[in-house]
Structure formats: C-alpha cells, structure tokens
Amino acid sequence: MELTGVTSQSIFDDNAADIKLSWVAGLEGADRAFDVEFAREATSAADLVGHLNLIHPNRIQVLGKPEILYYQRLDDEPRKRQMGELILLEPPFLVVADGMEPPPDLELRCTRSSTPLFTTPVSSAAVIDHLRLYLSRISAPRVTMHGVFLDILGMGVLIMGESGLGKSELGLELISRGHGLVADDAVDFVRLGPDFIEGRCPPLLQNLLEVRGLGLLDIKTIFGETAVRRKMKLKLVVQLVRRNDGEFERLPLDSQYLDVLGLPIHMVKIQVAAGRNLAVLVEAAVRNTILRLRGIDTLRDFMDRQRAAMQADVVSRGQGRLL
C-alpha cells in the first residue's frame, strides 16, 4: 500500500475529532510513519492497525481494556520485556482506548522513545474500524478524469467527449430535468473496493458548472440543495462522439467498457448531431444499463427471437418441400 506522507501527526489531525483522540506522550514523534517495507507488503488496511500484537509490532497498536488489564497483571520483568520489544520496533503510534488510563511506565517509555501515545474514550473496536477505513481511503488508487459527473436516476454517470461537444450544456439540461451534479470538468475518482469506484468534486469546483456563453453557474444556488451531490459510485460512462466518427458502431453486439483504475465500467457511445435530444438519449442509456445490470439485455433477447424465427422458417420450408 502507498502511504507516502502519512505520519502520526497527519493521522491524529484527520481523526482526533471523530474518535476523540488526546495526545498524552511522545510529542517529539509527530513525524513518525509506517515502516516503508511493511507498508508496501500490506495488502489491506487491516494489516496496518489492530489490537496489541507483538507478532506485528510495526502496525498501529490499539490497547483496550483487556490489554491494559493484562499488562497490569504482568510481573515487572515480563512487562518491561514485552513493552521494550514493542517500543524498539517503532510502531507509528499507540492508542489506549475504552477510556482506560495508560500505565505510568508505558507513558514514560513512550516519552523517552518519542513514541506517540494517544488516548480515547471510544471503544477499541470502533477505533480500529475507523482507522482502517481512513487508511483504506487515503491509500486507495485514485485518478482525476475530465468530464461531467452526474447522478442520473440514482446511478453515477460520467459524460466524456472532446472539447466543444456540449458536455456541460448536456449536464445543465439533465440537472434541469431533476438529476444531480457531482462534478464538472475535473472529477476525482478513488477505488475503495474490488468493485467500487467513488467520484467526488475537487473542493475548489464544488457546486460549479461552466457553460460556454454563460460562464460559471452555481448549481446549488440556482437549482437548490437537491440539485447537487457530494459523491456517487461510478457505474456508467457516456462517451459523446462526432457524427463522422468512423469507429461508431450502431448496434454493438458486445457490451462496451472503459477501464477506470483497473475496473471495467459500462460505456455507451452517443453521436452528437443537430436535432438529437441528448438528454433523453442519456436517460434511456441509463435505464437500459440498469436493466443490463439486472440481467435483461434487449439486444440479446431480440437476437434470440430472430434466430428462433429463422430456424422456424427453415423448418417450415423443409416440411413444405416434403409435401
């Protein structure tokens, strides 16, 4: 996993309010990060944070009530040895959860070794779940793509195409028909799971849509709160093409896909020409994609009916010759 620039300070700043973290020791270790080799070999965020475990000392160690009670029951020598092993391998930081007070000798060791020590009243399980989700998000593969990203009938749709084909005008038409804007011009996509790509708008462009001749439009102000979305799952790409595009296929026999962050996304191509109602065509494409995701393929059904009709015709002709 790629965790460049992720330090104990950045993790604390991003999560302190959500899980009520307090920094009680090891302030000098603010720039401490994951071991590079350990982070590279990690296959998921579950490898990076968990309950106290000396077998995996390089990860974020969370100590809940059971761990603290176990630590307190140990004799001096075993306790010193175990904590010495843990501190020696420099974990990014330790978290004492469940509202427990960190043992004084643990706090002293963290101070001397510049190992960040956090406390929180939140349960250890909730802390681990929250940090795993956070680390998954910041380390996930991401890309910025050009286009207009919309919520159409509950489906995340990215409209792409050459400059000047009317992507923003089409987006404005769809918004006026009750659909929602996620982002215009630049869309940030992040792959959060094996089949899950989420798209968001960069903060600088939030709620804005640029239309030639009109300039920048604040969609939230013009159309209201329900006309914008904070994020959507990417499910469909609509590619606008010029009418003279030689690669355009009128009846594609196979589904078309666009590779986004290693995940194949359904794609449809729509020719741009005078008199065509592109908004209606996009809505129809979305409805058809919804049917395909449910296992209903209109073109395949038609081909099956046509094949059955041709076979029946051949059989009837053969019987006619026999008569």
From Swiss-Prot:
Residues 271-276 are annotated as: Important for the catalytic mechanism of dephosphorylation. Keywords: ATP-binding, Kinase, Magnesium, Metal-binding, Multifunctional enzyme, Nucleotide-binding, Serine/threonine-protein kinase, Transferase. Its EC number is 2.7.11.-, 2.7.4.-. Homohexamer. Mg(2+) binds at residues 168, 210. Its cofactor is Mg(2+). One of its GO terms (molecular function) is protein serine/threonine/tyrosine kinase activity. It catalyses: [HPr protein]-L-serine + ATP = [HPr protein]-O-phospho-L-serine + ADP + H(+); [HPr protein]-O-phospho-L-serine + phosphate + H(+) = [HPr protein]-L-serine + diphosphate. It comes from Cupriavidus metallidurans (strain ATCC 43123 / DSM 2839 / NBRC 102507 / CH34). The keyword Transcription regulation does not apply. Belongs to the HPrK/P family. It is an enzyme of class 2 (transferase). The gene is hprK. This is HPr kinase/phosphorylase. It holds the Pfam family Hpr_kinase_C. One of its GO terms (biological process) is regulation of carbohydrate metabolic process.
